[in-house]
Amino acid sequence: KAVREKHPEITVVGTVGPFYEGTDYAEGWRLATEMGVPMVDEHYYVDPGWMIHNQDYYDRYDRTKSKVYLGEYAAHLPGRPNNIETALAEALYLTSVERNADVVEMTSYAPLLAKEGHTQWNPDLIYFNNTEVKPTVGYYTQQMYGQNAGTQYITSHITLSNGQEAVRKRVGVSVVKDEATGDHIVKLVNLLPVEVSSTVKLKGIDLQNPSAVKTLLTGDPKDKQARSVTSAFVDIGGTEFPYTLPAYSFTVIRIHENKGK
């Protein structure tokens, strides 16, 4: 209360412990609710399966309580590699986080930096030595989200020819608008070992003479060297267009209106 009165520009952030459940989590949230803490810092390091099966995690949150800063998170596999499997699990989960941006106001992968030969924790996002900087595969997931965050979420749905829950949970979509540029941004994640054919339908949106660029991150699940590649997206013709999601991939399609051209 004193901080809010003296420095209203400062947001007080509480903590709810290092896990997504348990005593610290429950008591932290109880205290935050009791004290009216504006925002809480959540941490969790989980296996990719947790991220696949908990895409409704923030759907269930009470909108009247504290906002969330997801301050530490990552997908962990045995041996702690940072590879296509972990990077795509994080990309898939972030589609649901983006959908719940009214609750989750900020996120940050952790840890961020580590010097080779002097690490206490793996995986980290960016490794370096005295002469090189070595971004991981997961870095490119973060970069693709960071450069295409948007400011307005647009409700979207994806329909698959195979309706099995196991299939549905491994394909994610998020659509946002960047109000500063007017660009519409479509994010598509495919954690399946096969291609997925889709038709993107941006209902209720009027695009004038659109053009688009596509950024794609894909590879074998164990690939630790994959990098995102950006290219022109030639199939854009309006608010409805086909797109085939490659197996094990994260795609960002950024659509720009060329008004007056």
Model-derived features: positions:
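Composition- and surface-driven signal marking solvent-exposed, interaction-prone regions
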Residues: 54-55, 82-87, 121-122, 126-128, ...
